[in-house]
């Protein structure tokens, strides 16, 4: 009884932690490791969705902590009008709270379940899906579970891709440059995924887009059978029928998407050039995950809105996920940019670090612009292979004597960015760097500070 009382008391404390900023409402959905609730931001009155994850259950399942980190990292990478946005991540000792954009219109699946869509409606949703998927692929992200159940609608009827739990990043590729994990929903999965011989995640996503388009236009699946083996046979042969009510242009697009050979499957640029797709298409404007225009908004989300403070931003608890592991391992903090970010620790104050970075950047021929708090934007003065390279740098103080500095790719060529971080700036920063990400220096005793850190 006493133990149960303590657990209930702990739950109340955690609810107050969330309710201090968010009001929890009805349960929206539930999975093996998480529950998703409707919530309201008490500061702005906006509706949000809050995913509540139990850390103990994560720890008991091998690989789930890393999968959660990767999912959140990916959501931060792919900020786009047609992707469900992540607002912030909070944590207590027992739970992680992922605060996301709330899609009031529910699943696209619910619309299709009532019957097929008109071609005009199907086209609009498909245009938004392709725009989102193309953006994700441009960031190196393959979704791997595209289906109407993972496509939500906001109150304006705008499509939002969600559920990046199975998504893959470039570092998950094997030496052959392919993915090998078989995942996804069978009826929507590409034949090369089912064959377990390695596959290109982006090309596999396009097959799934083809199945989604078919479902929107027809109201049923192209490959379906109560026996999985027979359904797989249909998928391997691309054996399906297009109903007569589907227009010729739409039919031709489906045929080019549902091609068994991934090398011959239509690409996203080719999709966007087809007459059927181009009709009425207005490309959405994506939001850069580290754009200087978003600095102030990010500060409000992470700092609790103290726009007058010029102190370094401290990390929230989830950024370290420190209560999931022992020691002072910062490697999990900065996965939001994956390849497009480099991190080092320093024992110098954040102000000194930024001042040094500004001097080094200018010495390399970059213009330097200070942002709010301890943020700095460095921009090349000449065009590179893919426009002008721009790098955003931010210093965070995770303890009184430890600062963490993150480089993030803002614009320009990724290879040039990697060279900038790995070669160009390192010599000039040698006197302030304690360790680069991946090193294992002897760390000071700051575990308590990292567990309890909160917005400044």
From Swiss-Prot:
Q: What is its EC number?
A: 2.7.11.1
Q: Key word DNA-binding present in the record?
A: no
The residue range of the signal peptide is none
What GO molecular function annotations does the UniProt record carry, in alphabetical order?
ATP binding; protein serine kinase activity; protein serine/threonine kinase activity
The question of whether ATP-binding is a record keyword is answered with yes
- Give me the segments passing through the membrane: none
Provide the top EC class. transferase
Q: What is this protein called?
A: CBL-interacting protein kinase 16
Organism, scientific name: Oryza sativa subsp. japonica (Rice)
Q: What is the lineage of its organism?
A: Eukaryota, Viridiplantae, Streptophyta, Embryophyta, Tracheophyta
What gene is this protein translated from?
Answer: CIPK16
